[in-house]
Structure formats: structure tokens, C-alpha cells
Amino acid sequence: MISKEYEFGKTSILNRKKYTLVIDEDKNGNFIRFTVLPVSNRKFKKVKQNGRVEINMGIQYHQIVLILLLNILFYVICLRSRFLEHINRTFEVTIARSFQILIIMGLFALGTIILVRGPSVETVTIFKESGLQLSRVKGMVIFPQQWNRKFFEQVEFISNERIIDVVINEGFCRGFRVIFYLAAIVRKSSTLKLLFPSNLPSIDDQRLIYNISRKYLSKQEKPLSRPKD
């Protein structure tokens, strides 16, 4: 675990095999923030931004390669088919072939950049005796994380009055494999509210988040610990 003190609080980075858990603690104890990054990399770049530490996951090379391959494939299809002639007949315009290819490739490149998104980054912020805020960012691969958070972040706040409990629930997935996931029981809701629906932390990290969340939400039950073998 890597921990560092800032003027606004303490940031801890727990690097796991399949993900990275970032914990931001407010120096006054007003809130704590848990962010799960769906990549494991000890060479993160940390950028101090608006009272928090933004973690730059680095360039998603596999996503960029996918965008390039899609554009190359579309270019070959345009050259070997009568696609450009069909466009000329449809819109009754005559444009030089080179300009046609340039325009179409530009539009297709823009479309792939918009549609091919980076991995989801999920954050749970727990405010002292107030509630919890869930956020999810699935931004563009060419944008830095702080830009994606600004333009593509989806945020939901659940007040303390609506939260009945925070639990670690047991479930089954394909192949009858048992999984555990953090969820909030919300008043007047027929389903559990998953805290990390896309990125599933390990059971030990879930216990850590569970115990801290109950402390911040004024739950007095005994903290969870790893069962003895």
C-alpha cells in the first residue's frame, strides 16, 4: 500500500492483481472516497486536482489499436466496394474521390473514438452522517481521467435517511461460482443498490470498505473480520 499526506487529507493506493483501490480520506473526517480502477499498475501518475488526487491510468493501448484497426478495415471496404458511388447517387453530388474518402474516414474515426470507450472507473464517496454518493465514469480513451470525469461522470446520491443498511451480499454467477459484492439496502427500493457494479473488489477490500462505511454512516454494529480457518 502506498500512502501520502496532502493538505486536504490522506490518499492510499492499494495495488491488486486485477484492479487498484484508491482511498481518499478528508483531513477533517467529513468524508472518505473509495475509487476502483479496473487496471493494476504500480506506475500511476498522480495529479492533484480540485481537492483530490486524480489517478491517470495511462494510455489504453489496446483500445487505440482497436480504433486503428476499425478505421483501416473501413478504409479497405470503401476502396473495394461501390460505397462511394452509392453515396454520390444518393445525395446527387459529385465530389472528388480523395475528398470523399477523407470525409468518410474522418466521420468514421470520430464515431469510433466516441463509441470505443475506456474501462469504467467507479467511486463511492461516503459523507459523515449524510449519505453516500455513487459515481461511474466511462470516458473516451484519448481523454485524461479528469476530463472524462468532468464530461462523462454519472452521479447518484443516496441520503442517510434512505439507507437501511450496507451489506456484503452473496450471489452466484455463471458456473455456480460464489461471489460477494457490496450493496446498499435503500428504503422503498425493491432491489439492492450495488456500490461497485462493474469492478468487483476482493472480499478483504469489501470488508475494509464495509467497516469504514458503517463508521461514517453512524452504524454501531461490530466490524467484520476475516473468519478463522
UniProtKB/Swiss-Prot annotation:
- What residues form the membrane-spanning segments? 59-79, 101-121
Listed A to Z, the keywords are: Glycosyltransferase, GPI-anchor biosynthesis, Membrane, Transferase, Transmembrane, Transmembrane helix
Subcellular location as annotated = Membrane
Q: Does the keyword Nucleotidyltransferase apply?
A: no
How is it placed in the membrane, per its record? Answer: Multi-pass membrane protein
Instruction: Report which reactions are catalysed by this protein.
Output: a 1,2-diacyl-sn-glycero-3-phospho-(1D-myo-inositol) + UDP-N-acetyl-alpha-D-glucosamine = a 6-(N-acetyl-alpha-D-glucosaminyl)-1-(1,2-diacyl-sn-glycero-3-phospho)-1D-myo-inositol + UDP + H(+)
Q: Name one GO cellular component term.
A: glycosylphosphatidylinositol-N-acetylglucosaminyltransferase (GPI-GnT) complex
Glycoprotein recorded as keyword: no
The protein's annotated pathway = Glycolipid biosynthesis; glycosylphosphatidylinositol-anchor biosynthesis
Question: Which EC number applies?
Answer: 2.4.1.198
A biological process term (GO) from this entry: fungal-type cell wall organization
- By its UniProt entry, which InterPro entries does this protein fall under? GPI-GlcNAc_Trfase_PIG-H_dom, PIG-H
Pfam families membership? PIG-H (PF10181)
One MF term in the entry's GO annotations: phosphatidylinositol N-acetylglucosaminyltransferase activity
Coiled-coil ranges per UniProt: none
Q: How does it assemble?
A: Component of the phosphatidylinositol N-acetylglucosaminyltransferase (GPI-GlcNAc transferase) complex composed of at least GPI1, GPI2, GPI3, GPI15, GPI19 and ERI1.
Q: What does this protein do?
A: Part of the complex catalyzing the transfer of N-acetylglucosamine from UDP-N-acetylglucosamine to phosphatidylinositol, the first step of GPI biosynthesis.
Q: Which family does it belong to?
A: Belongs to the PIGH family.
- What is the name of the protein in this document? Phosphatidylinositol N-acetylglucosaminyltransferase subunit GPI15
Give the originating organism.
Saccharomyces cerevisiae (strain ATCC 204508 / S288c) (Baker's yeast)
Phylogenetic classification of the source organism: Eukaryota, Fungi, Dikarya, Ascomycota, Saccharomycotina
